[in-house]
């Protein structure tokens, strides 16, 4: 338990286990339903979570990199406009400063941003998503998916072994007590394209990623050509790494970007 004068935060340990192909497929299906969650009936690209601005303003974070957010009720943008302006271009300056981008590299990102703004890579959301933007985790690399035994995080009544409400949604969803379930941590939640979360899972090779994709497709089929857009949707995570850590992330980012020029 962590406490301060004004508030408290209760946490519990997630005991991890080895994932399986079946667990990955179930995780993919549940991720599809998470992306489609929209109680307000609308969501724009870049939209921040409810009440976010009151505490943090309109800037989120991905590690130590700032993440521009759009206020609820802002002017809607297409995917390409949002992705260029808020998920690629803000990180070029830092990548130049640490030497991982040269002038030609920055120019390549600018050219790609123009293609994005022109709508070349706009594509429909998966079938279950009925809003402009899906509800993204936003930083869905493999380390932000923990695989835990179902009975380590919930009991049959939907409570954890620590006595707090945990994951009642797992009940009746096909997760046996001894089976691994995917638990999301450390989100950078915002409205975006569902393909971005899926692509980020494979930046650092999530286990059974093809099974995750298969489970997702069964629940919410992706738009035609999604495989060709995976590299594009990985660019945000790559350019953030180039801006934060430099080194080989710069050339890796530019190689991926040039595929779409």
What is the meaning of each model-derived region?
Residues 1-77, 81, 158-160:
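ATP-binding pocket architecture of kinase catalytic cores
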Residues 19-26, 107-116, 161-164, 180, ...:
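Phosphate/dinucleotide-binding and metal-coordinating scaffold of catalytic cores
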Residues 35-45, 95, 120, 124, ...:
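A general structural signal marking secondary-structure boundaries and capping sites
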Residues 53-120:
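Active-site catalytic-loop/activation-segment of kinase and kinase-like phosphoryl-transfer enzymes
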Residues 75, 79-84, 93, 129-135, ...:
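Active-site Asp-x-Gly
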Residues 102-133, 137, 144-148, 259:
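Short, intrinsically disordered, low-complexity segments enriched in Ser/Thr and Pro
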Residues 165, 241-261:
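ATP/Mg2+ or Mg2+-diphosphate-binding catalytic cores
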Residues 231-239:
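Hydrophobic alpha-helical segments that form the core
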């Amino acid at each position: 338990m962590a406490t301060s004068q004004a508030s408290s935060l209760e946490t519990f340990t997630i005991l991890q286990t080895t994932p399986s192909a079946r667990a990955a497929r179930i995780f993919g299906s549940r991720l599809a339903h998470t992306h489609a969650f929209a109680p307000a009936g609308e969501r724009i690209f870049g939209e921040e979570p409810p009440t976010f601005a009151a505490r943090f303003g309109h800037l989120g974070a991905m590690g130590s990199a700032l993440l521009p957010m759009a206020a609820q009720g802002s002017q809607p943008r297409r995917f390409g406009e949002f992705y260029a302006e808020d998920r690629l271009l803000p990180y070029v300056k830092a990548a130049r400063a640490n030497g991982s981008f040269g002038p030609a590299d920055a120019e390549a990102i600018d050219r790609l941003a123009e293609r994005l703004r022109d709508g070349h890579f706009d594509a429909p959301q998966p079938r279950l998503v009925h809003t402009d933007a899906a509800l993204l985790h936003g930083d869905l690399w493999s380390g932000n998916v923990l695989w835990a035994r179902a009975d380590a995080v919930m009991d049959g009544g939907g409570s954890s072994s620590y006595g707090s409400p945990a994951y009642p949604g797992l009940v009746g969803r096909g997760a046996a007590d001894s089976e691994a379930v995917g638990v999301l941590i450390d989100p950078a939640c915002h409205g975006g394209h569902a393909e971005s979360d899926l692509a980020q899972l494979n930046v650092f090779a999530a286990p059974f990623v093809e099974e995750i994709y298969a489970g997702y497709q069964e629940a919410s089929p992706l738009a035609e050509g999604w495989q060709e857009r995976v590299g594009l949707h990985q660019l945000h995570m790559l350019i953030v790494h180039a801006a934060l850590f430099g080194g080989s992330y710069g050339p890796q980012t530019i190689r991926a970007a040039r595929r779409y020029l």
